Structures are given as structure tokens and as C-alpha cells.
């Protein structure tokens, strides 16, 4: 690192002295606000639960199932506008919890490096026929699904969100949604480096296949050979 200074590469990769190779850096999502009133927190930034009756807010909040009567704080943009129903509830790292969501709230949200990699192989034999299978595996680590993120940003008129998003996006107050409201505005729910789009990168892959056949001994004796093996390898 130049002069030991941390830096970000490609708006997602984070490099810092003492850090890990492959760190993802961005905003950590804690879900979607179901109501405008869901953006309510204690002074310690514990999220409160708004009380509704017949769809009408009762101007009451619960904390751990009990009525809360203390001070109420909200998360806002740097310009002071509070986040609303359908927006991401962005977490803030220790030391920057002021309720204002800005670039200071980026943090390490995951890592691309696997914990374990390796291979497995086996050979099965039946009479003159044999089958070799070679597997490769990688366990742990994450990938950032930038393709899916870009598809669901609502920034490009020629791009249709995935069916998963269309059926699980926030549309009405109270929706327990997986994806935010379908708008591209200054709340920037489509901001790059969103922990929501981190996915488990673990996999096991059948990498090599070899099918072999040993010609019968009585066939090859006529050719004065010891063995003939015919195989196909993929």
C-alpha cells in the first residue's frame, strides 16, 4: 500500500494494512423499512416497532414487546431527509452512529477468499469397464452479484428486474418485503456495495470424467499385445 493508506478499488474492493485480501467494502443492509414509522430508534440505535390498529398508526412504539416512552431517533440522508417505508435500513459501524447515512458508514461486509479448497476423485470398475470422476470444491468465501444488482437498480429504462424482485419488492406500507421500493431517487437504494447482493461462493464441481474399456484378453492375444485400453476423457 502506498504510504500505508487504505484504498478502495472498483467501488467494492477494500485494501488496508492488516486487512484481508478479498475484502468487500460497502453498506450493510438490515432489511427494509415496512412503514415510514419503522424508521424509529432509541438513543442506542435499537430499532423500535410502531403500533398500528386497523392500519392506523397509534403514535406508540414497542421495544422488546413493551411500550417505549423514551427519545426517538431516525436515520436520515446527509440533507436531513429521513428514510421511509420501502427504503433499506442501513447499519452504521461502531464509532459513526449518528443516524446520518453517508460514505463514513461503509464497512467491510464480506470476503471473497474461500476457507478451504481441494479435490476428490474416485474410480469405479465393473468387469472391463472403468469410470473415473474428479471433483473440485471450494468452501466459504463470497461473491458480489453485480449483474443482479445492476439489473435491479431501476436506473436503466431498458432493463427489466428479475421476477424474484418484481414479486418481492416493497409497494405498500406494511409490506414485509425483501427488495426496496422500485424507484431511483436521492435515497439511492441501488447504491453500489450493498451487502444484500453478497452470495455464498461455495461449490463442488465435477471437473473430470474418464470412461475406459479394456478389450478382452482373448482379443488382444491375437494381436500379440498385453493390453488395449480405449477411453474417453472430458
Residue ranges and their predicted role:
Residues 1-108:
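Conserved small-residue
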Residues 100-108, 113, 189-197:
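Extracytoplasmic loops and strand-loop junctions of Gram-negative outer membrane beta-barrel proteins
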Residues 116-122, 129, 206-211:
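Hydrophobic, lipid-facing positions within transmembrane beta-strands of outer-membrane proteins
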Residues 128-133, 218-219:
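Repeated loop/turn-to-beta-strand initiation elements of outer-membrane beta-barrel proteins
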Residues 126-129, 225-227:
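Strand-connecting loop/turn motifs
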Residues 96, 100, 117, 187-188, ...:
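Core subunits and conserved enzymes of cellular information-processing
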Residues 133, 230-232:
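Membrane-embedded beta-strand positions of outer-membrane beta-barrel proteins
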Residues 16, 22-23, 34, 139-230:
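Extracytoplasmic gating/loop element in the C-terminal half of outer-membrane beta-barrel translocons
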Amino acid at each position: 500500500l502506498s504510504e500505508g493508506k487504505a484504498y478502495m478499488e472498483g467501488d467494492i474492493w477494500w485494501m488496508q494494512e492488516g486487512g484481508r485480501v478479498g475484502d468487500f467494502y460497502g453498506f450493510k443492509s438490515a432489511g427494509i423499512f415496512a412503514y415510514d414509522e419503522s424508521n424509529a430508534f432509541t438513543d442506542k440505535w435499537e430499532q423500535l416497532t410502531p403500533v398500528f390498529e386497523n392500519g392506523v398508526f397509534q403514535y406508540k412504539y414497542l421495544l422488546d414487546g413493551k411500550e417505549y416512552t423514551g427519545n426517538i431517533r431516525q436515520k436520515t440522508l446527509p440533507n436531513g431527509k429521513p428514510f421511509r417505508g420501502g427504503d433499506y435500513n442501513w447499519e452504521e459501524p461502531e464509532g459513526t452512529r449518528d443516524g446520518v447515512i453517508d460514505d463514513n458508514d461503509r464497512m467491510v461486509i464480506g470476503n471473497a477468499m474461500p476457507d478451504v479448497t481441494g479435490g476428490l476423485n474416485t474410480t469405479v470398475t465393473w468387469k472391463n469397464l472403468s469410470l473415473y470422476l474428479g471433483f473440485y470444491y471450494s468452501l466459504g468465501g463470497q461473491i458480489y452479484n453485480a449483474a443482479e444488482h445492476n439489473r435491479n437498480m431501476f436506473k436503466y429504462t431498458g432493463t427489466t428486474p428479475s421476477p424474484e424482485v418484481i414479486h418481492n419488492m416493497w409497494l405498500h406500507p406494511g409490506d414485509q418485503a425483501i427488495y426496496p421500493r422500485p424507484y431511483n431517487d436521492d435515497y439511492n437504494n441501488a447504491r453500489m456495495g450493498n451487502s444484500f447482493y453478497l452470495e455464498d461462493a461455495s461449490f463442488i464441481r465435477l471437473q473430470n470424467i474418464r470412461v475406459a474399456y479394456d478389450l478382452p484378453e482373448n482379443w488382444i492375444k491375437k494381436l500379440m499385445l498385453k493390453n488395449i485400453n480405449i477411453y474417453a476423457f472430458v
